[in-house]
Amino acid sequence: MSFSPTYSIVMASPLLTSSQMIPTTGSTVGFRSILPFGSLRLTRPYKKTSLFISYCSSVSKKAKTSATDLKPVVERWPEYIPNKLSDKNYVRVYDTTLRDGEQAPGAALTPPQKIEIALQLAKLRVDVMEVGFPVSSEEEFETIKTIAKTVGNEVDEETGYVPVISALARSIQRDIEAAWESVKYAKRPRVGIFTPTSDIHMKYKLQKTREEVIEMVASSVRFAKSLGCKDIQFGCEDAGRSEKEFLCKILGEAIKAGATAVNVADTVGINMPEEYGELVRYLKANTPGIDDIVFSVHCHNDLGVATANTIAGVCAGARQVEVTVNGIGERSGNAPLEEVVMALKCRGAYVMDGVYTRIDTRQIMATSKMVQEYTGLYVQPHKPIVGANCFVHESGVHQDGILKNRSTYEILSPEDVGVVKSQNSGIVLGKLSGRHAVKDRLKELGYELDDEKFNDIFSRFRDLTKQKKRITDADLKALVTTCGDEKLNGANGKESNGYVPVPQISSMV
């Protein structure tokens, strides 16, 4: 990912914080700039873009000349205060893959799988992980307790990071007791309590009046507090269809009773980004005590706008986002963690007043693949951020640009999300590929051809694309073989991008 061209950087150390190490393959270490994470923080914009570009160029040159001296920047995690953030621009990432995500049809996980995913989520550096609904079964209760005792107590010695472990409960005392008893072993335990707040839910599910629901919520929060829980989140189920004035009242009572965070859920995914953002703004402006807690957003994807709604909530002032890996969840799923996090990383500084997270985005692909494997829910190839086609190009025009500079058609670096790629390893040859891409791939395979021979091969390549959707390296070698003599660059061929070197070839007829 490149820097936003209109913002300046404040660095504790001009050299050490200009880049971070990125593990690649073997002993190779790559360097790239990361913004706005770690000690790189965005401040005021430069008045002239040229000044910013000039500054970045000087930083880049220093990094290149001193690469062997650079060390990874380690930043201490700020003190965790349940109802406050150390920085008004910091956005907490609340992952609910192990609770809401597991509710996706067919996504049931075994206890060992849930524990492994929790460990991976800790590597990803999520702030909060909601790991289940303990009252649902004894197995669920014990699994949550195990995660609380293990993952919830593994403190990173260098950074001080340890995740908040949360369990969900209805506004029922036995639910709340089960939730607290399962998570209390964690260093940072949280109990999440939810209650329906829309008229349709209160009438048909709860069969209670608004006044009765408000009292139920307040007493539930007080009960959780009486158990010793100091981190209590209250969530409004179906807030997207709830009356705004009623939401202000019930949230205010929950805060008054001791809630440290409140969650406004578009449970059925009915809201559009503009109206969801307006809802968040309204609640933040009219709810008593709202500035004394952390405001959270939870969006479902029934109309395909969960990511957009979540971002709209952040723009409106929310500072906790509730997401799932790969967007799995009930019906059409939830806001995908990878999309929300990368949107904040890529555009948070530029159009969202400098908001950021502390997610280690290099763990995104590994986390996505683990969740796919364990749930059996595999993402489509063009799924943003983690799909197989995200960093792959077939169009000739695009391939030409990518071969010259990847940033021509990629706004994110593959390495940013844990995908190691070279300059042209995302090139896929097919009917839309142009001469530049084909010639470059042949050269990487070890073939240097004059224009006449290449023209012959390219013509045959075009014919082959009418029979096959994708042309492989083996296909290219066969095309060269059928076209007569060619000159190898190197006695044993060239090894590139993980491909097997081409064997030495003598003149072929």
Swiss-Prot record:
Residues of the transit peptide: 1-55
Q: Where in the cell is it found?
A: Plastid, Chloroplast
The cofactor required is: Mn(2+); Co(2+)
Q: How does activity depend on pH?
A: Optimum pH is 8.
Q: Which family does it belong to?
A: Belongs to the alpha-IPM synthase/homocitrate synthase family.
- Give the EC number(s) listed in the UniProt record: 2.3.3.17
Pfam families documented for this protein? HCS_D2, HMGL-like
Any idea what job this protein has?
Determines the side chain length of aliphatic glucosinolate structures. Involved in the biosynthesis of glucosinolate derivative natural products such as 6-(methylsulfinyl)hexylisothiocyanate (6-MSITC), a compound found in wasabi with diverse health-promoting properties. Catalyzes the conversion of 4-methylsulfanyl-2-oxobutanoate (4-MTOB) into 2-(2-methylsulfanyl)ethylmalate (2-(2-MT)EM).
Q: How is the cofactor bound?
A: Strongly activated by Mn(2+) and Co(2+), and weakly activated by Fe(2+), Ni(2+), Mg(2+) and Ca(2+).
Activity modulation:
Inhibited by EDTA, Cu(2+) and Zn(2+).
Keywords, A to Z? Chloroplast, Manganese, Metal-binding, Plastid, Transferase, Transit peptide
Query: Which NCBIfam families does the UniProt record give?
Result: PRK00915.1-3
Q: List the disulfide bonds.
A: none
Q: Which GO terms describe its cellular component?
A: chloroplast
Which is one GO molecular function term here?
Answer: 2-isopropylmalate synthase activity
On assembly, the entry states: Monomer.
All copies of domain Pyruvate carboxyltransferase, residue ranges: 91-365
Top-level class of the enzyme under EC nomenclature: transferase
Q: What is this protein called?
A: Methylthioalkylmalate synthase 1-1, chloroplastic
Domain characteristics, as noted in the entry? The N-terminal part of the protein controls substrate specificity.
| Pathway as given in its UniProt record | Secondary metabolite biosynthesis
* Reactions the enzyme catalyzes: 4-methylsulfanyl-2-oxobutanoate + acetyl-CoA + H2O = 2-(2-methylsulfanyl)ethylmalate + CoA + H(+)
